[in-house]
């Protein structure tokens, strides 16, 4: 791991802002988020605008992890899952279509 990779591993994806003010990435343990109004909630649930809905779907801590992994791998984005089985299911559901077969 070169110096650039070490810097990315430590800092990529996290911006210290006046509202957060944290030097290190906090571990968000909330389960749900507040919506401005019903239109805001509808836009979030329909993916018309980015934001947080429910922590098992996405949260700021996972976002930083995904951004760091993407930076380290030179990618555009990354997906963090809660388990290897979830990673396999996500991959297969993304790549396979009706009628495809898997040989294991």
Place the predicted regions along the sequence by residue:
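Conserved N-terminal alpha-helix of the aminotransferase class I/II PLP-enzyme fold
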Residues: 37-86
């Amino acid at each position: 791991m070169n110096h650039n990779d070490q810097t990315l591993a430590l800092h990529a994806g996290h911006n210290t802002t006046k509202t957060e003010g944290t030097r290190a990435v906090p571990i968000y343990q909330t389960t749900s988020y507040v919506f401005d109004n019903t239109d805001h909630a509808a836009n979030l649930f329909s993916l018309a605008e980015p934001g947080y809905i429910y922590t098992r779907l996405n949260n700021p801590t996972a976002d930083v992890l995904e951004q760091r992994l993407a930076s380290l791998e030179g990618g555009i984005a990354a997906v963090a899952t809660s388990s290897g089985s979830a990673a396999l299911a996500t991959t297969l559901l993304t790549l396979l279509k009706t009628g495809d077969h898997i040989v294991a």
